[in-house]
From Swiss-Prot:
The gene is INP2. GO terms for biological process: peroxisome inheritance. This is Inheritance of peroxisomes protein 2. Belongs to the INP2 family. InterPro entries: INP2. It comes from Candida glabrata (strain ATCC 2001 / BCRC 20586 / JCM 3761 / NBRC 0622 / NRRL Y-65 / CBS 138).
């Protein structure tokens, strides 16, 4: 019995109460008084089972209180800790900084009892009263396996006790003591493994409360910065779109979790908790109305919806069914509000499953919700740099300080496009969810198609931005080859025109000007264009044909674009109108310059016709050195030949020949 004594040293002092039928027709109750019966003589055979196991071995262990207060019957402590975890949360309690902490020592999850054995060395496998504890080498995890089947032990002990009733031998007491130990360990293991889903649920619930607090704290920082922002600039719009999308997704996750949890709740208790914490179900129905616009008012409405659903979710956890299905109190008014708020809910969907499986299902659902909430928190945490860039510009600040402050905004040009795409995605999701009537299908399909088209345009724009560098380089490499290039300003034959030998022309592309993301950066980088003077170029061969051309691209901007601050004050309509005027101005100047260059080249061709005869004579004469100018004349003839027979001058050459032929026929 030394091994049995060691085992009960591990168990410690347990005081529990139980009333059970071990033999079917007799109640077994163990009392704490000493047994005065002697081991040799048993006067009453029926008193064998009723006799407490005491003084089996003198001076070893007192087994009188072994079956007192078995905890497998009562779940009061679990429900109390569950209620304390929910009620003491900051979402239901405004004075949460005054709450009393719940230490692990006072929790039902404290399994670290006073164990004096195996403290000095690490054991890879330890037999305990809760099962066989094994340690994995690779994963470094502990695994608890059940080594006693409660039903088999119960049947075996019952059959042995039935045979021992007619046995009066001395060894009967020793056999009876071993049977009681095995029966007690079977009760303990059955209780623990039945309670394990509740322990897991309570752990996941506390983790969910922590994640909700983290998400709420970082979300409030975003809301505070939006409220103090005076002007909605580019960064403010990005914050608004990001916060709107994340808030909408979080509200939908809370909504679906609350709707699923209603199947496990007691509606009578839920109505009482909603009354205690001031949850207005009529207001909740108004906040669930579908919203198709993205405004500041809608954002605050979504925030109110999240606060309501968060409180409602905790009240649902407080009113979870706990073996009291007969104690339901029907509330017709409250059930009507629930049907309006959750159309998929019906009272027939209440879960009637076993108590243990109920907590395991809820634990699995909370794990999935915690993963989604962690993802939303990580998105807000990664973009928290946007919070510190919404300050408005002061008058004393210079343009250099402004560029330094908004420098990080242009590192990733696709960020705003991705935020817009995320907004379009959640609008499509909202349309799909809000379809209820058959009459609204056509209108809803049109709205969904519009959102999908906008999303496709955003994706194409994002792809064009990523591939703009490679396309630009390929376009310039193709100019170096032979062929007829139709763009006069970027023709490869410009190097033969003297007017382009001493100046450089740089323009703002129309595509770049139409891009709102790059327009501000272009203007802020070139803010000194008003101090540039025009450069005059005179063509010697045209005898005084002077014209003016600017060397800086920003000279084509209007006065309203001189300062970047004025640009940010323009609304969408004004910016679009200015942009159209700018495009028209560039088109007019481009057409004018093309006409001037075409006229200049035509004059050059007419002058080259007068030298055609001299060119033929130069070709017939093999000795170029006989001419007066010698080598210089040879180089000039080669230049004139290359200029005359270049691919770009061929159309003009045929036009002149047709003109001369028509003049001769007249």
């Amino acid at each position: 019995m030394d091994s049995g004594a060691t085992s009960f040293n591990v168990l410690g002092e347990w005081r529990r109460t139980v009333q059970s039928k071990l033999l079917g027709e007799r109640h077994v109750g163990f009392v704490a008084e000493e047994n005065k019966l002697h081991c040799g003589s048993i006067k009453d055979r029926d008193s064998v089972v009723l006799t407490p196991i005491a003084n089996i071995q003198q001076g070893t262990v007192n087994y009188n209180h072994m079956f007192d207060n078995l905890i497998w019957v009562s779940d009061v402590q679990f429900m109390e800790e569950l209620q304390y975890t929910l009620i003491s949360s900051p979402f239901l309690n405004d004075i949460h900084h005054h709450q009393m902490p719940l230490s692990v020592a006072n929790s039902i999850m404290d399994f670290h009892r006073d164990r004096r054995f195996h403290r000095e060395s690490f054991i890879f496998s330890v037999p305990t009263k809760l099962g066989y504890l094994k340690a994995r080498y690779g994963d470094k995890k502990l695994e608890l396996r059940k080594n006693i089947n409660f039903m088999d032990v119960h049947k075996t002990v019952y059959s042995i006790l039935k045979h021992l009733r007619n046995n009066n031998k001395k060894c009967t007491w020793r056999i009876l003591s071993v049977l009681m130990i095995i029966l007690y360990l079977g009760y303990e293991q059955a209780h623990f493994h039945n309670q394990y889903p509740k322990y897991s649920f309570l752990t996941q619930l506390k983790a969910m409360m922590g994640k909700l607090q983290q998400f709420d704290s970082i979300q409030r920082k975003y809301f505070e910065n939006i409220n103090i922002t005076k002007e909605f600039d580019k960064t403010g719009n990005e914050i608004f779109q990001l916060l709107h999308s994340i808030t909408h997704i979080a509200s939908m996750k809370l909504y679906h979790l609350s709707e699923f949890l209603l199947r496990f709740t007691n509606i009578g208790k839920l109505s009482k908790y909603c009354g205690v914490y001031g949850i207005d179900m009529n207001l909740a129905y108004l906040t669930n109305v579908r919203i198709l616009t993205s405004t500041k008012q809608e954002l605050h409405l979504l925030q109110d919806k999240i606060e309501f659903l968060r409180k409602f979710l905790l009240c649902c956890f407080l009113s979870v069914e706990h073996q009291d299905y007969n104690e339901k109190v029907k509330n017709i008014i409250f059930s009507t509000y629930l049907l309006k708020l959750f159309p998929g809910y019906t009272e027939d969907n209440n879960c009637k499953s076993l108590f243990s499986s109920q907590w395991s299902v809820l634990s699995t659902v909370i794990v999935k919700f915690n993963q989604d909430l962690s993802f939303l928190y990580s998105v807000l945490n990664e973009n928290k740099e946007l919070i510190y860039s919404t300050e408005t510009r002061e008058e004393s600040e210079t343009d250099e300080m402004l560029k330094e402050r908004y420098k990080f905004r242009y590192k990733d040009k696709n960020q705003s496009l991705m935020l817009k795409a995320l907004s379009q995605i959640h609008l499509v999701e909202e349309q799909l969810i809000s379809v209820q009537d058959a009459d609204d299908n056509e209108e809803t399909k049109c709205l969904i198609n519009d959102h999908i088209k906008n999303l496709q345009q955003l994706i194409l724009c994002c792809n064009n931005k990523t591939n703009s560098g490679t396309n630009f380089s390929n376009r310039h490499t193709s100019l170096q080859g032979k062929g007829l290039f139709l763009d006069v300003l970027k023709s490869p034959e410009e190097k033969f025109t003297p007017i382009f030998q001493e100046m450089e022309v740089s323009r703002i592309g129309i595509k770049n000007v139409s891009d709102n993301d790059d327009l501000e950066s272009i203007l802020t980088d070139n803010e000194n264009y008003e101090h540039i003077e025009p450069a005059h170029f005179i063509d010697d061969r045209n005898n005084g044909g002077a014209f003016t051309i600017y060397e800086d691209s920003t000279c084509y901007a209007d006065d309203c674009y001189k300062n970047a601050s004025e640009l940010r004050k323009l609304n969408d309509e004004q910016l679009r109108r200015k942009l159209n005027e700018k495009i028209q101005l560039f088109a007019t100047e481009n057409k004018k310059n093309r006409n001037q260059i075409r006229q200049q080249k035509s004059l050059e061709l007419l002058r080259s016709n007068s030298t055609l005869t001299a060119l033929n004579e130069l070709k017939s004469n093999t000795n170029y050195e006989s001419l007066d100018k010698g080598v210089k004349t040879k180089k000039r003839a080669h230049f004139m030949e290359q200029e005359l027979y270049s691919e770009e001058t061929i159309p003009f050459y045929y036009e002149i020949n047709d003109f001369l032929y028509n003049q001769a026929n007249q």
